Amino acid sequence: MSADELTLLSASEQSRLIRDRKLSPVELMQSCLARIERWDPLLRAYITVCGDSALDVARVAEREIAAGQWRGPLHGLPFGVKDQLNTKGVLTTLGSKVMATNVPDHDATVIQR
């Protein structure tokens, strides 16, 4: 399956493949990052992309799943965070020029979970 095809699968299909160890969370994340890199210059949908940390999280998920510690259907799935939620150490502008340099020192509760 091509990288583009992986990103076009439903989240439930991606989750099933990850759970069944037929798809690596790292492979899926790399596919998503490649798609962002290819299309975001045109779409401008992302303010900040944290590719390195996303890959780190995917590697951890892959190790956990390989060790039989699958935590549920969202485990190992890539996700984006709207720029209106505080993310510790990551530029969070709230879509405003006034907040153009805002880098929170804490995560929003929904991010912590």
Annotate the PLM regions:
Residues M1-D56:
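An N-terminal boundary/leader segment
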Residues L42, C50, V57, V90, ...:
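Generic hydrophobic, aliphatic-rich segments that mediate packing or membrane embedding
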Residues A11, P73-V110:
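Enzymes and membrane/adaptor proteins characterized by extended Gly/Ser/Thr/Asp/Glu-rich
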Residues P41, E62, L85:
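N-terminal Rossmann-like NAD(P)+-binding subdomain of aldehyde/semialdehyde dehydrogenases
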Residues K22, Q69-W70, V90:
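Conserved SET/PR domain catalytic loop and adjacent active-site segment
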